[in-house]
């Protein structure tokens, strides 16, 4: 709408500010609505005891953030194929998270959809995204590593003729994109366990991803990433300790999918794993804990994900959050530095 009247560099900063402002304006109204309807977070009974006071805190704040991002991109971004693909991945995964949140609230429990239901949704979304990225946007099924190493994941490709149109199905790359999108979505979701933790970490990563997208020549994706960062900044005003609202799976699953989509569309699939290193560590802590307990009946961590381990060690919630923000920023900066080894 207004993208032609604003210099591309400024679009990114304006998008961050506009998305932040929209979130700041709409979130109080949403919090009031959630309180009126009695929609609140269900807290794990086996979690840290100090978290029990969070029971009933309004949730699904990710809805407002998604609306803010969509409105910002409508106003400031050029809607080309790459933006449509990234937006679709985010909104569809956010919708999956919304269903999970609704299920959780409706049944008064901390768990919503079953693991198989979530996985089926993530498989569908990631496969559709990958096929569209390869066949419509022309993304090559090659992953690049810093230093020049490249691995071709298109060596096992099936072509299907659909009424004169050829559909390429790169099986290895398809599986890789599924792992990336499902992995990052769940990793961000696992990180969302303390007030301000996931929102702050996503904000930091998306600022760096906006810089990556802009340097890659994708100004629309830069606006998209900046609008997510802006929405996170606005959200943190209400989610900082003690939180007035949580983003819910609506937000956490959506940000992971958006991160994965940006990584694929800017061909930074490997570097993105470094930039999102904090999310990866959080997810790995859960995997290690589960595997260790099943194999030896012993736990490696006092509690998983990792942020709860440090709470159990006596760190207060805000100290864990701020230190994890610093770690997330360090990983994002390292990934950004490695990006220059790709291009």
Which residues does each predicted region cover?
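Alpha-helical transmembrane segments
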Residues: 1-35, 65-98, 102, 129, ...
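Membrane-interface loops
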Residues: 31-48
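Juxtamembrane helix-capping/reentrant segments at transmembrane boundaries
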Residues: 44-57, 110-122, 307, 312
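Hydrophobic alpha-helical transmembrane segments
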Residues: 95, 119-128
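Membrane interface segments of multi-pass transport proteins and intramembrane proteases
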Residues: 104-113, 142-153, 162-166, 316
């Amino acid at each position: 709408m207004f993208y032609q009247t604003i210099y591309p560099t400024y679009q990114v900063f304006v998008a961050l500010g506009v998305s932040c402002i929209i979130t700041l304006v709409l979130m109080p109204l949403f919090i009031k609505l959630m309180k009126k309807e009695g929609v609140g977070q269900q807290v794990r009974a086996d979690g840290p005891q100090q978290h029990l006071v969070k029971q009933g805190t309004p949730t699904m704040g990710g809805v407002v953030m998604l609306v803010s991002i969509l409105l910002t991109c409508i106003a400031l971004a050029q809607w080309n194929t790459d933006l449509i693909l990234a937006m679709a991945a985010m909104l569809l995964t956010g919708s999956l998270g919304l269903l999970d949140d609704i299920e959780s609230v409706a049944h008064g429990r901390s768990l919503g959809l079953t693991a198989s239901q979530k996985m089926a949704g993530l498989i569908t979304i990631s496969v559709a995204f990958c096929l569209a990225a390869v066949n419509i946007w022309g993304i090559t099924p090659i992953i690049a590593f810093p230093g020049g190493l490249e691995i071709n994941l298109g060596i096992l490709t099936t072509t299907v003729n659909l009424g004169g149109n050829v559909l390429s199905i790169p099986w290895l790359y398809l599986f890789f994109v599924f792992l990336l999108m499902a992995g990052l979505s769940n990793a961000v979701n696992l990180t969302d366990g303390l007030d301000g933790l996931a929102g702050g970490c996503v904000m930091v990563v998306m600022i760096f991803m906006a810089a990556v997208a802009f340097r890659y020549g994708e100004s629309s994706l830069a606006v998209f990433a900046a609008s997510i960062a802006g929405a996170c900044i606005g959200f943190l005003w209400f989610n900082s300790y003690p939180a007035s609202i949580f983003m819910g799976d609506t937000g956490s699953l959506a940000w992971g999918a958006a991160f994965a989509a940006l990584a694929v569309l800017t061909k930074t699939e490997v570097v993105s794993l470094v930039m999102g290193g904090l999310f990866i560590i959080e997810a790995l802590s859960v995997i290690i804990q589960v595997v260790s307990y099943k194999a030896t009946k012993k736990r490696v961590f006092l509690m998983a994900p990792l942020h709860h381990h440090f709470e159990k060690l006596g760190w207060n919630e805000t100290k864990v959050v701020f230190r994890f923000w610093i770690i997330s920023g360090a990983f994002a900066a390292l990934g950004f530095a490695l990006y220059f080894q790709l291009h």
